[in-house]
From Swiss-Prot:
Main localisation: cytoplasm
Cofactor note: Binds 1 potassium ion per subunit.
Domain of life: Bacteria
PANTHER family referenced in this protein's UniProt entry, alphabetically: TRNA MODIFICATION GTPASE GTPBP3, TRNA MODIFICATION GTPASE GTPBP3, MITOCHONDRIAL
Protein's organism: Albidiferax ferrireducens (strain ATCC BAA-621 / DSM 15236 / T118) (Rhodoferax ferrireducens)
Subunit field text: Homodimer. Heterotetramer of two MnmE and two MnmG subunits.
A Pfam family per the record: MMR_HSR1
Alphabetical list of PROSITE patterns matching this protein: G_TRME
One of the protein's GO biological processes: tRNA wobble uridine modification
Binding site for (6S)-5-formyl-5,6,7,8-tetrahydrofolate: 26, 83, 136, 469
Name the record gives this protein: tRNA modification GTPase MnmE
UniProt-annotated binding residues for GTP: 242-247, 261-267, 286-289, 355-358
Entry's localization field: Cytoplasm
Length: 469
């Protein structure tokens, strides 16, 4: 799994671009003592913060700050790591980065060899990749680092921190250990068919498989909740012109984002805003009103409306209570409803909403949720309904931050275990097929933590990190 580039020493600015009080330049590699001497004029004691000048080639100070040295293997990457904490100006940090690269290429006065052969700028995520390759963290923990940085809600940050601490990985490890034990029983039965010992019956293989499936479902439920916290849901507001779609977006967002006028066709293109409901990011999209139109620009907007509807996790089909008895309005709504149903899979919920409840004198018996985007009446009910339909349990305390690939791997594991159960229950047990399904289930779990991963998968994952992590 290790590539030639993984042997190179690397350096990068580890703090976000822009001005700040403190900026960090991080170096990782093997035997960085000579580089330390060139940059700092001395060797550092391990894991001890030292305040001193950072020197250029002429031994003049570029800046003064704190230096920290973490010798291998007791560092984030598992290699020797040097961190320079300087003032956070972009020019200062670029000078320090350039000085590190320059010093790495300089000849050591004693050995007459470059101080740090091959020192180069780090690729995005390369420090975390080194930590993974050197068994300091597993793949799920590495991804949790990026998720913690990108967290947009408190619930997302806490669940990412939980995954980074190893809680999610520990659950996967327990599942894999149970799978390995079950595989051992099946392999023993296959390898010693002449023995008069029924390994599977004696060890209650059926019971073990059932327990494993139940544990897997518990982990899958928590991971699915974590995926909601990370990915959020995309909700599209759709309906005829002038039913209050833009007003509903503004009401949900608590801000005047979309233009609202009595003129039909005001919204020509989608308007998107991300809001939070119980810590879940909800990406709400206001769209052009659906109708037949001869206006070229409006027709483009309507086409885009159908595009976003097809990609939605949920659709809010908005109606106008004040026109509920108008024949032409009802007919147009029926056409739209049929078209929406044809665009979506059965798993995508469509919430029927009747707006302008504030205009109606008395309660209406119309089916669906009634609200007023103008007064806010009914919005809390809509928020709860949305989370309920996408499966949110409102208990983020035990949730792990998970990605869609984690959830899919868990689903594949469940499918393999189900097939394994069929083979186990069959009158003529196909033990070789049972063993294969258990092996595939174990591999699927291994993809989550990196125990079973291709180099291509690793490349995609770490390339999405920021530089310096």
């Amino acid at each position: 799994m290790s590539l030639p580039r993984h042997q190179d020493p690397i350096v990068a600015i580890a703090t976000a671009p822009g001005r700040g009080a403190v900026g960090i330049v991080r170096v990782s590699g093997k035997s960085i003592g000579s580089l330390m001497q060139a940059l700092l004029g001395r060797q550092l004691r391990a894991r001890e913060a030292t305040y001193l000048p950072f020197l250029d080639r002429s031994q003049l100070a570029i800046d003064q700050g704190i230096a920290l040295y973490f010798p291998a293997p007791h560092s984030f990457t598992g290699e020797d790591v040097l961190e320079l904490q300087a003032h956070g100006g972009p020019v200062v940090l670029q000078l320090l980065l350039a000085r590190c690269l320059e010093a790495g290429a300089e000849l050591d006065p004693v050995s007459q060899m470059p101080r740090l052969v091959g020192l180069r700028p780090a690729l995005p995520g390369e420090f975390s990749e080194r930590a993974f390759l050197n068994d300091k963290i597993d793949l799920a923990q590495a991804e949790a680092i990026a998720d913690l940085i990108d967290a947009s809600t408190e619930a997302a940050a806490r669940s990412a921190s939980r995954s980074l601490s190893g809680a999610f990985s520990q659950e996967i490890h327990i599942l894999r250990e149970a799978l390995i034990h079950l595989r051992m029983l099946v392999e023993a039965t296959l390898d010693f068919p002449e023995e008069e010992i029924d390994f599977l019956r004696q060890a209650d293989a059926r019971g073990q498989l059932s327990d494993l499936q139940q544990s897997l479902q518990s982990v899958l439920q928590k991971a699915s909740q974590g995926a909601l916290l990370r990915e959020g849901i995309t909700v599209v507001i759709a309906g005829q012109p002038n039913v209050g779609k833009s007003s509903l977006l503004n009401a949900l967002a608590g801000a005047e984002l979309a233009i609202v006028t009595p003129i039909a066709g005001t919204t020509r293109d989608k308007v998107q805003q991300t809001i939070q409901i119980e810590g879940v990011p909800v990406h709400v999209i206001d769209t052009a009103g659906l109708r037949d139109s001869d206006d070229v620009i409006e027709k483009i907007g309507i086409a885009r409306t159908w595009d976003v509807i097809e990609a939605a996790d949920a659709v809010l089909f908005l109606h106008d209570l004040t026109r509920k008895n108008a024949t032409d309005y009802i007919a147009a709504d029926a056409v739209i409803a049929e078209a929406i149903a044809g665009k979506l899979s059965a798993s995508v919920p469509v919430i029927e909403i009747w707006n302008k409840a504030d205009v109606i004198d008395r309660p209406c018996q119309q089916a669906g949720l009634q609200l007023s985007a103008k007064t806010g009446a009914g919005l809390d009910t809509l928020r709860r309904k949305l989370l309920e339909l996408v499966g949110w349990q409102s208990k983020p305390e035990g949730v792990y931050m998970a990605r869609e690939r984690h959830v899919q791997a868990l689903h594949r594991t469940a499918a393999h275990l189900m097939t394994a159960g069929f083979h186990l229950e069959a009158k003529a047990q196909a033990l070789d097929l049972l063993a294969e399904e258990l092996r595939l289930a174990q591999n699927a779990l291994g993809e989550i933590t990196g125990d079973f991963s291709s180099d291509d998968l690793l490349g995609v994952i770490f390339s999405r990190f920021c530089i310096g992590k």
